[in-house]
């Protein structure tokens, strides 16, 4: 009986881990931030990163999912 309960508990834990991993793999849509997970943009998109400056001082890097083969230029 103890073995059966232990096996059921292990299966539940494994299932929860798999569900959590699937949620982390969910793709990031267009124009959403991908700084922490650059490989998770939806198909047809790429994670493009920019270094942000405020008054000449670097304030970190931010990344966004954008369309592949699209180039953005400053105005």
From Swiss-Prot:
Principal cellular location given in the protein's record: secreted
Presence of the UniProt keyword Signal in the record: yes
GO molecular function, one term: toxin activity
Domain of life assignment: Eukaryota
Keywords: Disulfide bond, Secreted, Signal, Toxin
Family from the record: Belongs to the neurotoxin 19 (CSTX) family. 06 (U6-Lctx) subfamily.
Protein name (Swiss-Prot/TrEMBL): U6-lycotoxin-Ls1c
Organism per entry: Lycosa singoriensis
